[in-house]
């Protein structure tokens, strides 16, 4: 290993610790006197970084045994701060005590002027010299012992048999000084994800291209890593055949921001192989998202991972672990890493190399072709030379292992019976004899040759211990020896053959369930087991040999009545569009006669190619209803239910007289039959109606496609190539996860109307009564505008509805912000009928025409009908809302306007804290008064108008402050609010003056995803770990859980205590400001102060004055808040007549669920 110190390259042998190496830097000194600039390293990992440019200086060397009478004070002062265990007085005493002219007359007077802390005449020379010599002698003896041990280690000859290393992955880095001192969030804000680099994250924020769903573990790995930016980029060549796991093609990169001393560094983790691009191309893909050009910059290798094979050896893991802990030589070369890294693979030993960050893992494997045992080593080293050094070191460790294995085994045999059985004879360390010609590979070929219709090419993946077929003399010899034999098949399915097993641990031939495409003809296939299936009553062999002949006969009859018929034209057009075909189709519907064509039968036919009678379907439904895992799998699909009633759901699922609700209980079918289900009709793919969306991951199980008809449900299949018409026996009914139709259906399902809510993609809903032909979705993933186009008898043209934020419907997302259809109001009002209750109108000032009609949609959601009706006479009960609101800006920008105003307010508060810290030097009640009176605020109307992009760094002069740090405000009212904010900060201690005075970054600039620059080219969301109960969840403002029919989102938003948020209840037109409190008293004091003084004091411990009364409301799940009244006997009860009657600020109490603590919320009006 090479280390560069003071611009000089030094070689460090493997087996030398970091402390031992530091002794070599100071042969006549001690490591304690070494000064390291800029910081003292702790391990080799610190100094082997290619970007490390540290320097070392020996302080003892400039004061010990000198001739010069002048103490080198300036040279020592330059380095003394980097040696924390040495002080100046000690160096002065050593200088005096060890000086060569110590006995010269006038010595004390000559050196006195250059000394600061020590009087030369008072130095105890003997004591100083003895202490120094003792320390140096101890250092020299340890260095000599290290030399002896290294010589002994070098005398050990490494074992032979290593193969050439196979490169698995490499890590490269490059400096990017153009980033300067930009923070991680600033880098994320300027980065733009691309198709080849679709994922960027920092802290809890995740930035992706539209429609890209990150792997679940990506945010979990990066959300709590401070100060770095993480990327995931495609590391494969274009048009490479996709893997089953779509995320395996992405590899990582990270940007570590720099500072004034060190530039920022980008690190790339690049996999190596025929599928993967060169490191330069991978770096270019990441750099593209950062608008960087890295061409011409050298990529510095930081590490590499290789795989090495050591033939002709075996090892016992516990012996090797003991060796790495206790052997005087091997334990210095490598140390077992079990305390930090537990066994992930049985029989694997992990070792680290002397704190260098380099590791070696040992695992014993068996060659598939030859059957020989070998040791697989996975080496992580700095570079190519490091790999060679670690291979040599591993060879020496294994040589020591070979010499001491029997000794260690004998010791453990005294205490462990299992080891005692292994102790004699020990395992042969070299290659065993050549295998017999009937080895695994030959047997596998023979199986496929003699019974190709039973043993398909993928059979070996399903049966890890394959049998062999015996014939002729070999069969007779096996019978004489009394080996376990099995004849299969027995019922004339094909030629009967005799099977045996040659596996020592699995000597019994038996049968296993067949999951391959030939499972219709062969429900079971041969395999080898450790126990005899013939004597087990519930085994597959017993089921096959003693199965009911009548049942098999009925199964053949059912197969005979399965008919393949063409799909309807609409379904065929949909499937052609999915596959990119214009004509033709290989897909048909499989119909079964004589049995009910229910979803249960359809999935059973697809999985087992056997239909179910009505009685059997009833049994299957009853079994699913009693299966907790099947019912639990339906949970997220049952969010549409207003009440949680598991007993009712079980009755519905298990009752054969109730039609099976496929869209509601399809998860139970997926769980019971271990498959993935897609549902389609003649129009296309069907999304489930769960309000929170169906989280669908890429399929890794067999996939079943169901075609839903008016009164039946049938599976979609691909008949055999020789089928023409009529009954069909074989065919493809379950599709592979990598089949084109499965992949494309998954992509279609995920990409149809991609919408994100709280960082989670939400599939759109289908509306049975609102024929939506287009919609506008805001950046929070909520639909704000619906273009409705009635059909049939009600078809009289399109109209536009602007609604409170709602989940999107299954309709195209409009990219336009203008040109929404308007017309007369009679047709839309007639179509909406009683679902829309008008309550107001807005009239054009210029023309007098009614442009907007406001009201309540479906009794829950505020909506506005856009019209242009010059003749409509409003109902007297309608209120005049003044001029139109939705002329300009357009409705889709409503949320952006809110977040922009909130960001301006937050920036003004931070600038006010910065300004008072600079101008006044303190933040007290007096300094706030002085700051406001002495020009701390400058009223500048229109100064902040139109601002959409904000600078995360303080700037003066700038849009928020003058050159003298006077804060710009649009009016006097805003200045008063800022004074109030400063007064609150002075009381709460949230304005640290020294930090604000020196700060260049605006504190809390990036708090939510809306604080980043928004663009249609990407989406940015906050990742939340629902399992982490300590994480504070952000608040969703203005949320109406409209489809569920609940009064409020349940449970209520969880925020930090004392942080306010907006809250709306379904059916109540007003918006409340809410704040969570730890106690009822705190919430009551906040509500009372708000009602009397007009401000919220936040979370306090104050009590309301005696005699004051604050209303208390209770919120029950599924209902609006209601008043809590005190009866005559002092008990509390809910006033059911007051549901939704919230007219005065008060305290709301609720429980999230049974057993949860009581929550206290102040409702402020």
From Swiss-Prot:
Stretches for region Disordered: 422-442
Pfam families linked to this entry: DUF5757 (PF19061)
InterPro entries from the UniProt entry: DUF5757 (IPR043920)
Taxonomy, superkingdom: Viruses
Protein name (record): Uncharacterized protein 041R
Origin species: Frog virus 3 (isolate Goorha) (FV-3)
């Amino acid at each position: 290993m090479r280390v560069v110190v003071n611009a000089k390259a030094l070689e460090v042998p493997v087996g030398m610790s970091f402390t031992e190496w530091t002794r070599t830097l100071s042969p006549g000194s001690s490591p304690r006197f070494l000064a390291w600039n800029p910081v003292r390293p702790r391990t080799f990992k610190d100094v082997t970084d290619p970007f490390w440019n540290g320097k070392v200086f020996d302080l003892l060397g400039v004061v010990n045994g000198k001739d010069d009478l002048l103490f080198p004070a300036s040279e020592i002062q330059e380095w003394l701060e980097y040696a924390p265990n040495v002080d100046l007085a000690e160096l002065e005493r050593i200088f005096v005590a060890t000086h060569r002219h110590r006995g010269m007359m006038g010595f004390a007077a000559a050196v006195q002027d250059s000394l600061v802390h020590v009087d030369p005449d008072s130095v105890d020379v003997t004591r100083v010299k003895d202490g120094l010599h003792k320390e140096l002698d101890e250092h020299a003896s340890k260095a000599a012992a290290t030399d002896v041990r290294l010589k002994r280690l070098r005398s050990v000859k490494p074992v032979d048999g290593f193969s050439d290393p196979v490169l698995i992955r490499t890590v490269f880095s490059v400096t990017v000084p153009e980033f300067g001192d930009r923070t991680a969030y600033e880098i994320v804000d300027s980065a733009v994800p691309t198709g080849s680099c679709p994922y960027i994250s920092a802290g809890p924020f995740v930035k992706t291209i539209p429609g890209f769903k990150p792997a679940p573990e990506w945010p979990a790995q990066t959300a709590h890593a401070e100060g770095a930016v993480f990327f995931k980029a495609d590391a494969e060549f274009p048009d490479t055949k996709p893997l089953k796991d779509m995320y395996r093609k992405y590899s990582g990169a990270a940007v570590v921001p720099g500072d004034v001393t060190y530039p920022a560094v980008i690190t790339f983790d690049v996999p190596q192989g025929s599928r993967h691009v060169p490191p330069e191309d991978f770096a270019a893909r990441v750099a593209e998202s950062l608008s960087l050009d890295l061409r011409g910059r050298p990529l510095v290798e930081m590490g590499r991972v290789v795989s090495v094979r050591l033939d002709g050896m075996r090892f016992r893991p516990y012996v090797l672990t003991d060796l790495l802990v206790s052997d005087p030589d091997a334990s210095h070369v490598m140390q077992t890493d079990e305390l930090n890294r537990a066994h992930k693979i049985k029989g694997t030993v992990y070792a680290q190399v002397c704190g260098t960050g380099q590791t070696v893992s040992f695992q014993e494997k068996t060659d598939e072709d030859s059957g020989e045992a070998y040791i697989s080593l996975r080496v992580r080293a700095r570079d190519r030379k490091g790999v060679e050094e670690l291979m040599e070191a591993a060879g020496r460790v294994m040589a020591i292992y070979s010499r001491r294995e029997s000794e260690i085994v004998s010791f453990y045999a005294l205490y462990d019976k299992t080891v005692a059985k292994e102790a004699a004879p020990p395992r042969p360390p070299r290659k065993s004899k050549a295998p017999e010609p009937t080895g695994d590979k030959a047997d596998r070929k023979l199986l496929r040759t003699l019974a190709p219709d039973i043993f398909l090419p993928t059979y070996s993946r399903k049966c890890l211990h394959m049998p062999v077929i015996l014939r002729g003399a070999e069969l007779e010899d096996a019978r004489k020896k009394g080996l376990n034999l099995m004849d299969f098949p027995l019922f004339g399915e094909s030629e009967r053959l005799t099977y045996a097993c040659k596996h020592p641990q699995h000597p019994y031939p038996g049968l296993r369930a067949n999951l391959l495409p030939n499972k219709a003809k062969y429900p079971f296939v041969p395999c080898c087991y450790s126990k005899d299936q013939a004597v087990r009553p519930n085994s597959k062999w017993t089921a096959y040999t003693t199965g009911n002949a009548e049942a098999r006969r009925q199964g053949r009859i059912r197969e005979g009545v399965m008919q393949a018929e063409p799909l309807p034209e609409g379904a065929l057009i949909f499937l052609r569009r999915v596959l990119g075909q214009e004509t033709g189709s290989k897909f048909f519907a499989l119909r079964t006669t004589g049995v009910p064509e229910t979803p249960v039968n359809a999935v059973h036919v697809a999985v087992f190619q056997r239909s179910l009678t009505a009685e059997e379907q009833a049994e299957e439904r009853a079994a699913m209803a009693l299966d907790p895992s099947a019912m639990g799998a339906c949970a997220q699909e049952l969010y549409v239910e207003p009440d949680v009633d598991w007993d009712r759901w079980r009755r519905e699922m298990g009752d054969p007289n109730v039609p099976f609700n496929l869209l509601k209980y399809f998860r139970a079918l997926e769980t019971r039959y271990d498959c993935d289900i897609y549902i389609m009709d003649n129009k296309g793919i069907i999304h489930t109606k769960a309000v929170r969306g169906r989280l669908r991951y890429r399929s890794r199980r067999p996939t079943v496609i169901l075609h839903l008809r008016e009164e039946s449900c049938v599976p979609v299949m691909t008949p055999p190539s020789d089928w023409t018409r009529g009954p069909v026996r074989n065919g493809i009914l379950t599709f592979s996860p990598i089949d084109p139709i499965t992949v494309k259906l998954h992509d279609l399902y995920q990409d149809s109307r991609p919408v994100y809510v709280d960082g989670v993609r939400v599939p759109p809903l289908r509306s049975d009564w609102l024929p939506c032909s287009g919609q506008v979705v805001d950046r929070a993933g909520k639909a704000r505008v619906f273009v409705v186009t009635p059909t049939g008898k009600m078809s009289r043209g399109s109209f536009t509805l602007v609604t409170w934020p709602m989940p999107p419907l299954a309709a195209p997302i409009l990219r336009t912000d203008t040109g929404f259809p308007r017309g007369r109001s009679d047709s839309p009002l007639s179509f909406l009928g009683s679902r829309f209750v008008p309550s107001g109108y807005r009239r054009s000032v210029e023309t007098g025409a009614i442009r907007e009609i406001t009201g309540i949609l479906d009794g829950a959601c505020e909506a506005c009908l856009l019209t242009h009706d010059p003749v409509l006479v409003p109902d007297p009960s309608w209120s005049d809302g003044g001029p139109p609101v939705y002329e300009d800006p357009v409705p889709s920008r409503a949320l952006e306007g809110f977040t922009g105003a909130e960001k301006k307010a937050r920036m003004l508060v931070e600038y006010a804290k910065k300004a008072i810290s600079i101008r006044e030097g303190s933040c007290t009640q007096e300094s706030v008064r002085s700051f406001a009176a002495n020009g701390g605020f400058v009223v500048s109307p229109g100064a902040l108008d139109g601002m959409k992009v904000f600078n995360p760094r303080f700037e003066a002069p700038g849009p928020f402050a003058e050159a003298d740090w006077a804060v710009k405000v649009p009016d006097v009212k805003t200045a008063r609010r800022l004074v109030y904010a400063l007064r609150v900060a002075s009381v709460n201690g949230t304005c640290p003056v020294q930090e604000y005075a020196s700060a260049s970054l605006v504190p809390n600039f990036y708090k939510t995803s809306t604080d980043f620059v928004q663009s249609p080219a990407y989406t940015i969301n906050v990742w939340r770990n629902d399992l982490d109960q300590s994480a504070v969840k952000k608040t969703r403002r203005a949320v109406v859980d409209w489809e569920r029919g609940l009064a409020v989102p349940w449970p209520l938003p969880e925020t930090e205590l004392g942080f306010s948020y907006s809250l709306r209840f379904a059916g109540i037109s007003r918006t409340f400001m809410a704040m969570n409190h730890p106690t009822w008293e705190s919430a009551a004091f906040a509500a009372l102060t708000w009602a009397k003084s007009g401000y919220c004091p936040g979370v306090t411990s104050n009590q309301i004055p005696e005699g004051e009364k604050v209303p208390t409301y209770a919120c029950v799940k599924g209902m609006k808040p209601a008043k809590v009244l005190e009866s005559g006997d002092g008990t509390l009860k809910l006033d059911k007549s007051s549901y939704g009657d919230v007219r005065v600020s008060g305290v709301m109490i609720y429980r999230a669920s049974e057993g949860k603590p009581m929550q206290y919320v102040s409702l402020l009006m």
